[in-house]
Every structure is written in C-alpha cells, then in structure tokens.
C-alpha cells in the first residue's frame, strides 16, 4: 500500500504544481501560525521581560544537507534567495540598536528585550533577546548555502537605517515599527514558502528560522496593537498595498509616508533576486503573503485591549508615560 512521504510541510511532492505547493503552504501556516502558537508567543512577553531566555533550536545534522532536498525550485534560484536572505539578516546589531533607541522613551522593558543595555559611552553591556535569537540566522544561512553550493560565501552586509528622532517619540516609534513589522512579516512569509520547496535537513533549518520570525512578529505585532490601538487596520491595508507593488500589473502608489515603507518592501524583494523568479514562484510567494496576512488579521481581531495590556504593560512604561501625554492619532496614508 502506498504511503506518502510526510515532512514538516505535509505531504512531499518532488515535482509539485501550484495547487500541491499551495496545500503545503496552507499546512505550514496552520502548523506555525495557528492562533494558539501566536498567542503563546505574545503571552511569553511578561516572562521574557523578567528573565529573557533565547528559544533553543533543535539539533541540526548539517552533514545531511544535500541539493536533492530542494524540490520544485531550481537550485540556483534557491541559492540566490538564500544569499539575499543572509545579506539582509547580517546587520542585526544595527537593527537591534536602532529599534532600542526608538523604544527607550516609550517602553524601556521592550527596548531592553530588543537591544539589551548600553552604557553612556555606547558600549553594549547586555545583549537583547531579539539579537541573541536573530544573530543565529546569518551563520545558519551561510552554512546552508555552503552545504548546497559546495562553495564558501561572504555576506554583503546591507546598510541599516540609523535612529532619527523627530518631534514626537510615539510617532517616531510608529513609523519605525512599521518597518520592523514589515521586515519580520516578510521574513516569515519567505521562510515558510521556502519550506514548501524543501525537505529533510534543509527544511529543518528553514523551520528554525521561521519559528524565530513568527515569535518576533507576534510580539512586535501585539505590542504595536497595544501602543497604537487605532493603527491595526491601517497596518493591514498598508501591507496589502505593499504586496500590490510587486504584482505584475504596473502600479504607482500615491501613498506618501515619511517612513518610506514602499522602499522597504521593494528593496527586500530586490535583494532576494525577485526579478529572476518564474511566474509560478512569484505567484506562490504572493499567495503566501496574502494568506499569512489573512491569518494575522484574524488573530489580531481577537485580541482585546485587556488581553494586550496583560501581555505588554510594565511598570516602567507607566513611569515613562504620564496620563497627560496624549498619543497622536496615527495617520500613514
């Protein structure tokens, strides 16, 4: 009796069509972005504020990685995507310190979780949990690339935007937070889609990356909803508009934003060598973008203000923000 091979993305298809890949994508979304999983990651915040502990990866047998584990996707395209991902992941120190600076005036505990603690002279005296987890990604992607390509690679580190304070810390954090959420969302979508085109140890590496990104996405998304309760619907609409910018149909956005979110999304896709992908692969990733966004919207619609408060509030937040300090009404369109 025929027994289909099963991996982390469901039934394995070595020559998949769009509909078979779609089934694997849907299966992975249910496994890694279920309501319970997202809720657990958000509810983990209070404990992580008190005693931050990095998520442990499973044991990976790197010697078991081989090119045949990439399925339904040309190896050179897969490798170009991995190279783009590791180049994007590489400047993690810059990412964490910039986010810490935006968070410190508003939520010191979240700032510490993200970027650790820094002395007056700029010396880092404690690494943030986010950096501890994310700094594993570039070495893992580099090793994955080298095992599949049988050649070494040196990351071409991208330039991260530096901290720029304007007039209102809440508005500054909101604009920066959009970049952060879009980046985490994009990474989660990419790694989940790549899981649908891999199996074996190669897929296991991608699943560890995905779990980290989903963890961070849930925390940043939930924190953003708590700090900016009027911004959730605008975020969904904005993410949809960014997906629109990479559709084959010519599109010129009329949206103006000082954060320049459009360039964030398009630059990310350019680094991933998007222009060389087949129409099928583009369609699969766009499908992944939309379905994960749908899942995040459904999950976030269930989060009450009381629940968000229980996950995100800390005494130092209220010490930093008097009741007289009115948050600006967030407008990004």
Protein language model features and the residues they cover:
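Non-heme di-metal
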Residues: 1-333
